[in-house]
Design a protein with these regions (language model features):
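Short catalytic-loop micro-motif centered on adjacent basic/acidic residues
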Residues: 13, 103-104
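N-terminal helical cap/lid subdomain that shapes the substrate entry/recognition surface
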Residues: 2-90, 94-98, 111, 123
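Substrate-recognition "cap/lid" segment bordering the active-site pocket of phosphatases
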Residues: 103, 109-126
Length: 126
């Protein structure tokens, strides 16, 4: 019998990967960078993403990373309600009803996980 299910957040509960890729490119283009196509950095960690975007200038990479995280991202938040997998809540509620424990495993920041949980209305089944 299944006792617990772990759900990944990005790409499973909420389709954020495409949004993150596009948001990063929009930021970089505002800074004068050009992309022939949007790089798919899905599943990469933050240091690897920024090294891929700015491979040759460590100081510029760090300045852009900080500005993106502290200014650009808060000004361009993830629209979780629009990107939420519509099966998230019903599946978790059904599992909970059957006595299966549910949890979210994610490398996302805790405040983002909490925001998703609130928007999805699933705090009571985790």
């Amino acid at each position: 019998m299944i006792k617990a299910v772990l759900f990944d957040m990005d790409g499973v509960l909420v389709d954020t990967e495409w949004f993150y890729n596009r948001r990063r490119v929009a930021f970089m283009e505002e800074k004068g960078f050009h992309f022939d196509e949007i790089p798919d950095l899905s599943g990469s960690n933050e240091p690897a993403i920024w090294e891929a975007l700015v491979p040759d200038d460590i100081e510029l990479r760090e300045r852009l990373r900080v500005e993106y995280k502290q200014v650009y991202s808060p000004d361009h938040p993830v629209p979780y309600a629009e990107l939420l997998n519509n099966q998230t809540e019903p599946v978790m509620r059904e599992l909970h009803k059957r006595g299966v424990k549910c949890a979210i495993a994610s490398s996302s920041y805790r405040e983002l996980i909490d925001e998703l949980v609130d928007i999805a209305g699933i705090a009571d089944v985790l």
